[in-house]
């Protein structure tokens, strides 16, 4: 099993399905070029085209094909494996829904291919800008953050409990990894206060 399949957490059967599927070398070459340029939009567009033409294994073939470049974006092996495990996670979500190995998360997994997202402990983080038409001020009225201000975006990946200690650990690691940011944003559905009406106190 080669590095990509090991680092992303695939089984041998999943690797076999991906490797043995027909390959569009022309399109895969364009995908590699997009990843070398860290062009997430181009990567997503090409993979959607590939999935439409060849089926849902194309995206996974593309991630494998560009892995030598992706690996350079994640020099820390622990962080790389934690981050790329999201690929096999979404592959299994797809298989559970459709009954075949594949993935249609072209836009989301473009982050991973281009080294634009990292998983630090329980949470994922990426560079971003404050998306809301809101101004945040301190007690003296000084503007701290407005729409478009560079911020750290936080994502809550599937799998495992969301314990306070795990969240605290992730935030501490992120503070060291992304020391340039003063603000973290998260717009997950998990933060919807209405969930308290239907979820138990022990739920995420």
Please provide the spans of the model-predicted regions:
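Non-catalytic substrate-recognition and accessory regions of acyl/acetyltransferase enzymes
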Residues: 1-162, 177-183, 194-204
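Short linear interaction motifs
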Residues: 167-171, 175-185
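An acidic- and aromatic-residue-enriched active-site/binding cleft used to recognize and process polar
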Residues: 186-192
